[in-house]
């Protein structure tokens, strides 16, 4: 069984035991987050308005890989380099 969940305007197709990285959530490590799924998918049928919740356990908070932003104006001797690391949360799907 799989479930389609939405977190911070992003959708994820998950099943029990999956580990995934989601945008930073304000929850402590070890806490459980309950989400209502958008859809549940079995082998034979798909339920668009399912009952029940998906439980996610917060494993850790970390930063994503660095993204380099480089600006340059030709012939003006102007160039600027900036880096950014997005905060992420790693979660594990406990149950559906």
UniProtKB/Swiss-Prot annotation:
SUPFAM superfamilies: L21p-like (SSF141091)
Matches recorded under Pfam families: Ribosomal_L21p
Record flagged with keyword S-adenosyl-L-methionine: no
Biological-process GO terms, alphabetical: translation
Residue intervals passing through the bilayer: none
Keywords from the named record: Ribonucleoprotein, Ribosomal protein, RNA-binding, rRNA-binding
Keyword check for rRNA-binding: yes
Coiled coil feature spans: none
Molecular function per GO: rRNA binding; structural constituent of ribosome
UniProt xrefs under InterPro entries: bL21-like, bL21-like_sf, Ribosomal_bL21, Ribosomal_bL21_CS
GO cellular component term, pick one: cytoplasm
Family stated for the protein in its record: Belongs to the bacterial ribosomal protein bL21 family.
Subunit text: Part of the 50S ribosomal subunit. Contacts protein L20.
Biological role: This protein binds to 23S rRNA in the presence of protein L20.
HAMAP family given in the database record: Ribosomal_bL21
Record-given protein name: Large ribosomal subunit protein bL21
Gene behind this protein: rplU
């Amino acid at each position: 069984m799989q479930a389609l969940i939405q977190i911070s305007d992003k959708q994820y197709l998950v099943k029990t035991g999956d580990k995934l990285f989601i945008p930073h959530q304000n929850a402590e490590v070890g806490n459980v987050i309950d989400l209502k799924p958008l859809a549940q998918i079995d082998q034979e049928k798909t339920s668009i308005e399912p009952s029940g919740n998906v439980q996610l356990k917060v494993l850790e908070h970390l930063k994503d890989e660095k993204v380099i932003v480089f600006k340059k104006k030709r012939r003006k001797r102007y160039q600027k380099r900036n880096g950014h690391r997005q905060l992420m949360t790693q979660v594990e799907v406990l149950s559906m």
